[in-house]
Amino acid sequence: MAAKDLFHEVVRRALEKEQWVITDDPLKVEVGGAKFEIDLGAERVLAAERAGEKIAVEIKTFLGDSPITEYHAALGQFLNYRLALELSEPDRTLHLAIPITFHQAFFQREFAQLSVERYQIKRLIYDPVQEIIVQWIS
């Protein structure tokens, strides 16, 4: 089993505050002979007459010494998880959970902006102190 990131419970509580129901912790996906454990699976009913929205969230702390190395590893993991979900659960959307301080410091750089645009990285920006989701970025 993969080690839980430092802010795993923080993001879980933040999602629950926004009325998400955690369905899987972790969300286990097996496809093409590969097994993955994505940090969280969640869903939320949008309205009684509409289908529920389903997401998967990969939580990152980005507390390492090299921001670009941390991002590089997270991006590779995200792309593999997204492919696995497209094949096994196409109705579930993957989001990368990023602490607000790292987002403000790293994702304002031109390279980071070009990368998330090119690879269409959906991001969930969270505040680990207040335990809230600050922003959803598609």
Residue ranges and their predicted role:
Residues 3-8, 12:
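Nuclease catalytic cores
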Residues 55, 60-80, 84-85:
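Mg2+/Mn2+-dependent nuclease catalytic core
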Residues 118-136:
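Charged, structured surface patches that assemble and position nucleic-acid processing machinery
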Residues 83-116, 126-128:
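Nucleic-acid nuclease catalytic cores
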Residues 21-56, 70, 134:
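Active-site metal-binding core of divalent-cation-utilizing nuclease and nuclease-like domains
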Residues 41, 60, 129:
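Anionic group-transfer/hydrolysis microenvironments
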